[in-house]
């Protein structure tokens, strides 16, 4: 490819909504352009990187025995209503009607459709297992699309589905896919960690996420320093913390004028925040839920949602608080009257506390000397707090560490949730009917590209892993005015026939400094410079983007050296 012909219009000024580095660099390097909020057009450089990720995915998923198919993006509402997810997806689902008034959606995922599809022609145990996948666009009406390809409304995804006779068969398929995902992300040159995950709206009884480790990640990843435990923070039940304080005093109301936050109250009462109880009030579908955690803890909202089986999770409104007899800033379960569609739940650690302080449900007043197990009355008790850095590992008792990650893939053991709802059954060798046991397996293709940039960049631009770099090599003639320099660059370019589709010749009529700057921005793994040194000594300069290492070799040996370097980069997945 000649750089003069490459369609990659660079930007000098970036839009204000370009916050993360992948978004900034993909816009600046002319890799994509925003069409609407959350939707992007992929220009040649981004398209090539995306296609390379797809190629790796296909190679590894095909090894598992899965077969590629392609399913419709437009899906009828009926199949979603059978599983109950027409309502569950809520406003995130793009919904539309045809001219006859029939309801459809733009596919956010394909569990319903693939289950319906497989059930049409699969009825016997002799036809199982079935393993299929596709790579295509998905659509989710994100409330706040942001971070470029990290959270967009239209994105490219690989989604796979397996159908088995029993749990044992599913376990085998799950292991095959888990191992394939490990190979895929390794080949993409990513530093990642598989973690235990919550199944979310898709459902199922087991799930793992594959998280790319990056400071810009939206996910909090919990792992243990002493064992191999790792999980998304939302999927962890932390251990209950015992209380070593003993108190027999009766609870007492004290004046706390203007003290309406945990920090303010604890400072006013000269109390440790660990001896306070925090109240957070949610609206879970139609039910107002008062959640109580220790003052230094946060509520695990995903766990809370799962406990109540809620579709929508919002903060309670002022009207909700008033209806339930709650005074904002001074809330507690003590003395509350029973109200319809109102529930109280306390974290297990709270129920271990003694001599605590909490709200009194009156403005400017709090309780002290509270023993929640004694004073809170009939409340629901469960583990609803979020695990924190330094907590005890729930598996081995070691120390918990929390880092940031970008989810690029997830695997699920779905079980029979969809097959039962949609009638996907088979007959065993005795003629008895059973629901198929399903698994599903997703990879965010465009998100993988963005995550790679988040993990691999510096102040000058992108540092692509060679396997997914749009091009692997750029040849830069540093002196455009010299015909012999240009001729030498073209001859080297022509000689790279084994890598003809992976080499760019920067033949633009630009200064060498601009070419070098663009090469670093775009992130070519290898740059070959032919200039004054070649004219003076016959040597050319090879520079590695990742390490910054520069190697001088005779012109005649350049091709062989570049091929050697590329082979080494591929072998090391760098």
Annotate each language-model stretch with its function.
Residues 54, 111-119, 144-160, 168-441, ...:
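Extended, low-hydrophobicity, polar/charged segments
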Residues 1-98, 161-200, 297:
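TRNA-binding/sensing appendages of the translation machinery
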Residues 265, 439-468, 472:
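C-terminal, non-catalytic macromolecule-binding modules
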Residues 75-79, 320-321, 507-514:
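Short acidic loop-to-helix transition motifs that present clustered carboxylates
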Residues 492-561:
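C-terminal structured "cap/appendage" subdomains that terminate the fold
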Residues 87-104, 212-223:
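Acidic, His- and aromatic-enriched active-site or binding-groove loops in soluble protein domains
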């Amino acid at each position: 490819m000649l750089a003069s012909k490459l369609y990659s219009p660079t930007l000098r000024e970036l839009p204000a909504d370009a916050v993360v580095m992948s978004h900034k660099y993909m816009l600046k390097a002319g890799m994509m352009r925003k069409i609407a909020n959350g939707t992007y057009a992929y220009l040649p450089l981004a398209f090539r990187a995306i296609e390379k990720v797809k190629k790796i995915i296909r190679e590894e998923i095909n090894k598992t025995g899965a077969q590629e198919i392609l399913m419709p993006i437009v899906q009828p509402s009926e199949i979603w209503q059978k599983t109950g997810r027409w309502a569950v997806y809520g406003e995130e689902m793009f919904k539309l009607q045809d001219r006859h008034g029939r309801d459809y959606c733009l596919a956010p995922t394909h569990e319903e459709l693939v289950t319906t599809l497989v059930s049409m022609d699969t009825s016997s145990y002799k036809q199982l297992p079935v393993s299929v996948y596709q790579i295509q666009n998905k659509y989710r009406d994100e409330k706040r699309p942001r971070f470029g390809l990290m959270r967009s409304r239209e994105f490219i995804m690989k989604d796979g589905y397996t159908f088995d006779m029993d749990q044992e068969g599913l376990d085998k398929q799950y292991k095959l896919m888990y191992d394939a995902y490990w190979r895929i992300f390794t080949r993409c040159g990513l530093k990642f960690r598989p973690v235990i995950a919550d199944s979310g709206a898709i459902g199922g009884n087991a799930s793992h996420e594959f998280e790319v480790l990056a400071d810009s990640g939206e996910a909090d990843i919990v792992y243990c320093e002493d064992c191999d435990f790792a999980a998304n923070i939302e999927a962890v039940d932390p251990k209950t913390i015992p209380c070593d304080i003993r108190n027999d005093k009766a609870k007492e109301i004290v004046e706390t004028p203007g003290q309406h936050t945990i920090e303010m109250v604890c400072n006013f009462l000269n109390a440790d925040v660990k001896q306070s109880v925090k109240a957070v009030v949610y609206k879970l579908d139609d039910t107002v839920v008062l959640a109580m955690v220790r003052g230094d803890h946060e509520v695990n909202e995903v766990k809370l949602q799962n406990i109540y089986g809620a579709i929508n999770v919002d903060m309670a409104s002022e009207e909700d608080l008033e209806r339930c007899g709650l005074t904002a800033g001074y809330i507690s379960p003590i003395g509350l009257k029973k109200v319809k569609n109102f529930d109280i739940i306390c974290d297990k650690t709270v129920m271990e506390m003694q001599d605590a302080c909490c709200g009194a449900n009156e403005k400017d007043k709090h309780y002290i000397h509270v023993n929640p197990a004694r004073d809170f009355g009939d409340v629901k008790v469960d583990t609803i707090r979020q695990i924190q850095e330094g907590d005890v590992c729930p598996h081995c008792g070691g120390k918990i560490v929390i880092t940031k990650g970008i989810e690029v893939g997830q695997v699920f053991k779905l079980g029979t949730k969809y097959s039962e709802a949609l009638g996907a059954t088979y007959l065993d060798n005795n003629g008895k009917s059973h629901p198929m046991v399903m698994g599903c397996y997703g990879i965010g293709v465009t998100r993988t590209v963005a995550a790679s940039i988040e993990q691999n960049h510096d102040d000058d631009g992108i540092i692509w892993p060679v396997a997914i770099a749009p091009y692997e090599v750029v040849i830069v003639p540093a002196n455009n005015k010299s015909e012999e320099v240009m001729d030498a660059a073209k001859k080297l370019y022509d000689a790279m026939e084994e890598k003809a589709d992976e080499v760019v010749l920067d033949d633009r009529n630009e200064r060498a400094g601009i070419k070098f700057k663009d090469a670093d921005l775009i992130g070519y793994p290898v740059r070959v410079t032919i200039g004054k040194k070649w004219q003076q000594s016959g040597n050319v300069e090879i520079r590695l983007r990742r390490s910054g290492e520069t190697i001088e070799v005779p012109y005649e040996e350049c091709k062989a050296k570049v091929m050697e370097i590329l082979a080494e980069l591929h072998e090391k997945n760098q």
